[in-house]
Amino acid sequence: MESQQLSQNSPNLHGSAYASVTSKEVPSNQDPLAVSASNLPEFDRDSTKVNSQQETTPGTSAVPENHHHVSPQPASVPPPQNGQYQQHGMMTPNKAMASNWAHYQQPSMMTCSHYQTSPAYYQPDPHYPLPQYIPPLSTSSPDPIDLKNQHSEIPQAKTKVGNNVLPPHTLTSEENFSTWVKFYIRFLKNSNLGDIIPNDQGEIKRQMTYEEHAYIYNTFQAFAPFHLLPTWVKQILEINYADILTVLCKSVSKMQTNNQELKDWIALANLEYDGSTSADTFEITVSTIIQRLKENNINVSDRLACQLILKGLSGDFKYLRNQYRTKTNMKLSQLFAEIQLIYDENKIMNLNKPSQYKQHSEYKNVSRTSPNTTNTKVTTRNYQRTNSSKPRAAKAHNIATSSKFSRVNNDHINESTVSSQYLSDDNELSLRPATERI
């Protein structure tokens, strides 16, 4: 009876995987399910009775035929060799494009949970085939790498890698992220990954491989706990938890903004104005710097701006320092207006200076030449020169000679007036005065 009942319930027993489990060796030419219940041990009979009372699982057709029956208990899966990443070979950019894995996207074969934090640095497994761009962090010498096995299409980095690369420090607060990311970027460059890091314009030299992507992701999450990241970084990682390069690209852009802020502060503190440029240009320059700082949430008060401007004034604008020294309520617009007023006054004075000098020079030229003088070289045949055309030294000599001659010979000339007239009448000669000698 018992064997007949077992044969009638054989389909159900075959469908239940646990009903046929034994620890004995079964001949390969005999189906273990065909063994009669009388040959089974007592504990097997009890398990048969318990399992026969359970609900039937899928039919016989759902169980594959297996001549060597194996226990269907779930096998324990061994842990991955590389921590939370699966072991993969080196993926070239061509293979990445062929597998529809685009740059900056989350790869489908990267099996890691959503941004898990790790207190320690990620140590690669020695059995994992790491590429040569990842230097060892231990003091032991790295294993030699066979360059012949490297794929020819993999672009090699040009930077030199040292034996040891110091890892970045762990992020301690959200406010220190901008400082921490500088050390992290330097760490990647020292790891020979500088050609896949975005530059100031957001450009990269080459596409990263899967192993490089996994390495960057793992090191980033190891040293930057998620709860200490800024809000804008969390928003990027919530959309794509592995998009670390976008975070680095925006971080570089923010660093450029911070550098511009520093440059603006330096330019504002070193303002100088002496009137060599127009007052409008100076006002536009200062207003642009202040507006740029305001866009970066840095407000510059009018009092501070006026003090920095007054410190750099020189020349005719320097007296404004004393005027504003006692003022408590300084207005930047009022200071610009006074600078403009002084600049306009100086401009008018500079325009009038050339015309005054021109009139003065013309007056000098007119006073030196008499308008009644004529060119005696052309009109007179005896080539007599006028007193105005003679040099000053000749004039002085002639005047001195004539005065002396007149004093000595004045009486003699008066006495010989009759004789001179007689000669003049006879010979038609005229005596020239001594002053007319050449």
From Swiss-Prot:
Parts forming coiled coils? none
List UniProt keywords, sorted A-Z.
Answer: Cytoplasm, RNA-binding, Transposable element
Segments of this protein annotated with the region Disordered: 1-88, 360-403, 418-438
- Disulfide-bond pairs as recorded: none
The UniProt entry's GO CC annotations, sorted and at most eight, read: cytoplasm
Q: Which branch of life, at top level?
A: Eukaryota
Localized where? Answer: Cytoplasm
Q: Where is the composition biased (Low complexity)?
A: 369-382
Q: Which GO terms describe its molecular function?
A: RNA binding
**Principal location class:** cytoplasm
Residues annotated as site: Cleavage: H397, N398
List, in alphabetical order, the GO biological process terms annotated in this UniProt record: viral translational frameshifting
Q: Where is the composition biased (Polar residues)?
A: 1-39, 49-60
Q: Where is this region: RNA-binding?
A: 295-397
Q: Name one Pfam family in it.
A: TYA
Please quote what the entry notes about the protein's domains: The C-terminal RNA-binding region of CA is sufficient for all its nucleocapsid-like chaperone activities.
What is annotated about its quaternary structure and interactions? Homotrimer.
Add the further remark from the entry: Retrotransposons are mobile genetic entities that are able to replicate via an RNA intermediate and a reverse transcription step. In contrast to retroviruses, retrotransposons are non-infectious, lack an envelope and remain intracellular. Ty2 retrotransposons belong to the copia elements (pseudoviridae).
What is its biological role?
Capsid protein (CA) is the structural component of the virus-like particle (VLP), forming the shell that encapsulates the retrotransposons dimeric RNA genome. The particles are assembled from trimer-clustered units and there are holes in the capsid shells that allow for the diffusion of macromolecules. CA also has nucleocapsid-like chaperone activity, promoting primer tRNA(i)-Met annealing to the multipartite primer-binding site (PBS), dimerization of Ty2 RNA and initiation of reverse transcription.
Q: What is this protein called?
A: Transposon Ty2-DR1 Gag polyprotein
What organism does the UniProt record list as the source? Saccharomyces cerevisiae (strain ATCC 204508 / S288c)
Name the gene behind this protein.
TY2A-DR1
